Amino acid sequence: MTTAAQVSGLDVAPTRHARLVAWVREIAELTQPDRVEWCDGSEAEFDRLTSLLIEQGTLVRLNDEKRPNSFYAASDPGDVARVEDRTYICSEQAEDAGPTNNWLDPAEMRATLRGLFAGCMRGRTMYVVPFCMGPLGSRISALGVEITDSPYVVISMRTMTRMGTPALEQLGTDGFFVPAVHSLGAPLEPGQADVPWPCNTTKYITHFPETREIWSYGSGYGGNALLGKKCYALRIASVMARDEGWLAEHMLILKLTSPAGKVHYIAAAFPSACGKTNLAMLIPTLPGWQAETVGDDIAWMRFGEDGRLYAVNPEAGFFGVAPGTGEQTNPNAVRTLWGNAIYTNVARTDNGDVWWEGLTKQPPAHLIDWKGRDWTPESSEPAAHPNARFTVPAGQCPTIAPEWEDPRGVPISAILFGGRRATAVPLVTEAPDWRRGVFFGSIVASETTAAQAGAIGKLRRDPFAMLPFCGYNMADYFAHWLEVGQKADQTKLPRVYYVNWFRKSPEGRFLWPGFGDNSRVLAWIVGRLEGTAAGVETPLGVLPTKDALPVDGIDIAEEDLETLLTVDVEVWKQEAQLIPEHYQTFGERLPAALWTEHEALVERLNSAD
């Protein structure tokens, strides 16, 4: 067995943080790497690691004239996405993980992990990656250290976080950090050849909420391996937020400037495939309005001394789904991707560029698909994997707001919730108070099947868009949101809105144009915040009057607008009947206030007859 004394680089730690140094030594003794490297985040380090990855066959450098300083990687076909069935919240008590998370006894899990991690880095380098989630020096930010045996993870963390020496200096000699251990689970014996994408068929993505630890084994894919992202910024941070009185949320942050020059910041939570990145990079079709991006995926929010809720984007990059991203849907994302990007599981063109479905209207005549095969438009499979990804610095976005790295954060005026609903849910509804807003967040769903006329399709609930990402019992999470509202100055809380861009006609036609025209809904929301936009009370909440929604310049039929801005009482009676089944999932821990909200909705619907 390799001892710590035999591991090259272990005794040259560039820090006097005793707990960190002891932890690195402990993991090195367990995993037995050939050497240890402390990452500084420098360009020289990035160049060295990308050269190493090219040599190993993991990366291909793209055409520098087309995509400067950009790289392509193809994963193992069995390692292409987050593995929710292998993701665990190992709280001390099972009930603290709740019914929506996988739980195993933490002592049992630790024993399993110790067995898997024993010797798992043999023949490899162990990289120590200090990183900061959020702007360096912000009171809203927090630090972490990831140990990994994947240089692909190191270069990706350099894009996605503030990584290296600045984060290590911020940590000082005794600062708090979240320890995150990652291994591909692919040790190399002496003389054994490596593969381009090492991984293991056994996978565990494990969180220990009480000790704020993350252990990930067997996967090299982003969400499972870049442990600052979902693992820390949502699962562990949501527990920290519960304990410390703040919010860690799966939300974009958007800066909106009205024609009068007034600025509002909006946070929005949508499940996957509901247009979050598109809204974060919105190009308004309304004349005089400007939209800028603060964040596209995660928001950390704390109350400021003035009583307002301030948000930072804890990430430094975008880790986006490539397919469906194009000039028609998200031109700002396309312009962000001019260079300094890592593409995973997209297709490659004959001239050393990348392509994916949705990038252009017509595909190239020939490609190399994500599995390395020749591809033509006649091929039966997509050229890019549906979950193909790009990793790119956020600062390259042409609409990035100057405030995106402000350590003070930005004050949030409104919070939006929404799913992909073909039926029932109006275009936009204002909650009269915070509690109704929490109720809206708790019932977010997307329709997974088409509905018959006058009925509702099968719903997949994703409350607050946090179902895969909440690090503790979701009923307690709802209670935390309610408590945050109760403790705050009610006059300074953000207003809450329930939006739905995806309403369809009975024939399956979208009623709302969406994309840049969603700025029209945001304009009404800003009007509500400023007291200038008219609304009408409904059993659900306040909807725009037809005259209050600015629809000049878009082709929308009068009856479609009527449908979008109406609460159909009979359909909502059906909708209300579906909520108890969802709530009963959470048992007795569900806050009574949400049952009260549900009962009040039923009463308002019955009174509306």
From Swiss-Prot:
Gene Ontology biological process terms, A to Z: cellular response to glucose stimulus; gluconeogenesis; glycerol biosynthetic process from pyruvate; oxaloacetate metabolic process; propionate catabolic process; response to lipid; response to starvation
Enzyme Commission code: 4.1.1.32
Binding site for GTP: 273-278, 389, 420, 515-518
Pathway info: Carbohydrate biosynthesis; gluconeogenesis
UniProt-annotated location(s): Cytoplasm
Highest taxon of source: Bacteria
Family in the record: Belongs to the phosphoenolpyruvate carboxykinase [GTP] family.
HAMAP family: PEPCK_GTP
Protein name: Phosphoenolpyruvate carboxykinase [GTP]
Organism per entry: Frankia casuarinae (strain DSM 45818 / CECT 9043 / HFP020203 / CcI3)
